[in-house]
Amino acid sequence: MDFFSTSSLSSYYHLIFTILAFVISSIIYFLSKKAESKKLKLPPGPPGWPVVGNLLQVARSGKPFFQIMRELRQKYGPIFTLRMGTRTMIILSNADLVHEALILKGQVFATRPRENPTRTVFSCDKFTVNAAVYGPVWRSLRKNMVQNGLSSIRLKEFRAVRKSAMDKMIEKIRAEADANEGVVWVLKNARFAVFCILLAMCFGVEMDEKTIEKIDQMMKSVLIALDPRLDDYLPILSPFFSKQRKHAMDVRKQQIKTIVPFIEQRKKILESPEIDKTAASFSYLDTLFDLKIEGRNSTPTYPELVTLCSEFLNGGTDTTATAIEWAIGRLIENPNIQSQLYEEIKKTVGENKIDEKDIEKMPYLNAVVKELLRKHPPTYMSLTHAVTEPAKLGGYDIPTGVNVEIFLPGISDDPNLWSEPEKFDPDRFYLGKEDADITGVSGVKMIPFGMGRRICPGLNMATVHVSLMLARLVQEFEWADPENTRVDFTEKLEFTVVMKNTLRAKIKPRM
């Protein structure tokens, strides 16, 4: 191809203008940020390059981000600053600082920072419980989810759905074990069960396995499309990521195309219940059709309904499923804990199948789950916070527009808060040697679900799902390593913190 053809010249000039724009914008941005930072007392942190900040240092280190956080915490203390391109992150990794920010100064630290353009599209301009800025939209959405969608009364209405999903999970595990000399994949089976429950709760109908798989694959595509990209931190580079943006928009279109038929189906069922007598009398979606949003005259649009339903499904699936995988891994590693849990189950229900009403009578199960959430919180970082107005924390300035991140292992692994924090030990809770309020209100020692005004609204549902699923799995099967293997507890960050090598376990039926 002739380099000096019209199309080549066009591409050439586009590249030149992009580079010039980058250089000029970088100089302006750097000078403005430098002037601004001189006026503020930000927490300490590693020195960075102009414009890119610490972005290249993090990328070139070759280390997992959580390992970098641990090293920076050791060097700079419990509160430090990291500059990632145009984003400034202030990381908290100390219980007292987190309590001050999210409880004592909770209203100031209750909002969310700006999103990248891709996330803004998928969230319908922050129209979700988790992403909404602190204000009327967030209040309306959260109040509806807590009071109408996930209240204790509503959760009880889906007991039959949870029982059915547990039974199907056990059947699938038995069939897989029969075909593979007793060896099964833990995460895959747990994820399927949780997703079945959440689909039924969201849309009010039970679906066949093929439909469930179709929706699940679509939801995974959404999570992949939302993975951070370089242009999220350096927007000036966005012209070089047009292909990725187009792919993300295609995923969004597919998301809407997949979910809207279920929204329309549910609307028809509410208008004419006789068309599907197997449908549930209530679903989370029902609460959204006529939802009044403070400050708005209109009810949610179809794209907004798709976004809210997707939040409901994605928010509770991987977090619960990965918790189960970690739990089974810990029970394999500690057969004495597994045996004690099984004995409590037998003592509580005898030969009957364990039901969720039995969970409250099982203190050792509750201790195992609590220790699981301490040792293996769903993520390394809580959902990002931001301040509604300039604030002070730990003697430092917290300006608006920065990302306030909470590094959870800095708290749950703190030897000043826990005895032998590296050890998986349910007895710390069961024997009353230690305790922790997982909501963080009375003090911060572990915050697997966030805390304060932005605490996860699905906290109660998640603990029920994890407790019930773990109890059923231990009641039905004895869990062990496959021959010549050991559980690998190496971590990897995906949407949640997962096992780097997905857990395969050998089961022996008990019942």
Curated annotation (Swiss-Prot):
Residues that span the membrane, as ranges: none
Gene3D superfamilies (alphabetical): Cytochrome P450 (1.10.630.10)
Keywords: Heme, Iron, Metal-binding, Monooxygenase, Oxidoreductase
Record's protein name: Cytochrome P450 77A2
Keyword Oxidoreductase: yes
InterPro entries documented for this protein: Cyt_P450, Cyt_P450_CS, Cyt_P450_E_grp-I, Cyt_P450_sf
Protein family (similarity comment): Belongs to the cytochrome P450 family.
Keyword Oxidoreductase: yes
Cofactor(s) needed by this chain: heme
PROSITE patterns attached to this UniProt entry: CYTOCHROME_P450
The organism of origin for this protein: Solanum melongena (Eggplant)
